[in-house]
UniProtKB/Swiss-Prot annotation:
UniProt cross-references to Pfam families, sorted A to Z: LptC
Primary gene name: lptC
Highest taxon above the source species: Bacteria
Protein name (Swiss-Prot/TrEMBL): Lipopolysaccharide export system protein LptC
Family: Belongs to the LptC family.
Main location: membrane
Subunit structure: Component of the lipopolysaccharide transport and assembly complex. Interacts with LptA and the LptBFG transporter complex.
Length: 209
């Protein structure tokens, strides 16, 4: 009887030890899992923001562009920022004397007046301020009596420093009393210049007297 009781006691003790070991092993795995969640994955962004608004200034202190987005993701490793549903407002960085004089008469600061609005489904901004726009890309001129009023395409690249714009997809542009389509685009938003290439078609609006 004594031997049987000793065996039972040892079995209980060993069972308790086994349970403690299992509990310790489980808690160790949980801590490891928690720590792995804290470690940033190589392909994950360093910063994520929602409903963001950012104003960027030129070296001489003038507004260069205003960017709004439903979501942004910034990656430090390649110094790129991804935008979801971006809106980018461009400002004039050199003075057009005619427009400057007109705004002065209306007590409007020329360099604080937004000149173009860019929109797209997605966008990617590089460290050199090159903006890659993808999906339902629209460049809308916000100034009055502009020669070039609107650009529509599916993909475009805009240099935010120089306001050069290019596209390798089908493009439609609308200007004062005309509209044109083509397969490629080279232009400059600041200068209101857009040159279409390949299969270009232009339609003129005849004003009614």
């Amino acid at each position: 009887m004594i031997e049987i009781k000793m065996n039972i006691r040892w079995n209980v003790i060993l069972g308790v030890i086994a349970l403690c070991a299992l509990a310790w092993f489980y808690s160790l795995n949980q801590e490891t899992a928690d720590l792995s969640e804290l470690v940033k994955k190589p392909d994950s962004p360093d910063y994520v923001g929602y409903k963001m608004e950012t104003t960027v200034f030129s070296p001489d202190g003038k507004k260069q562009y205003l960017a709004l987005s439903d979501k942004i993701e910034h990656y430090t490793v390649n110094e790129q920022t991804l935008f979801t549903a971006p809106l980018v407002y461009l400002y004039p960085t050199t003075s057009n004397e005619k427009e400057k004089e007109k705004n002065a008469n209306q007590n409007v600061d020329f360099f604080s007046t937004q000149s173009w609005k860019l929109s797209a489904n997605q966008a990617r901004l590089t460290k050199d301020q090159i903006l890659y726009l993808e999906g339902n890309v629209v460049a809308q001129n916000l100034t009055s009596d502009s020669r070039l009023q609107r650009i529509e395409t599916e993909s475009a690249v805009v240099n935010l420093k120089t306001q050069d714009i290019t596209s390798e997809t089908q493009v439609k542009i609308k200007g004062k009393n005309f509209s044109s389509t083509g397969l490629k685009l080279v232009g400059n938003l600041r200068q209101q210049v857009a040159t279409l290439k390949e299969q270009v078609k232009t339609y003129y609006e005849v004003s009614k007297q």
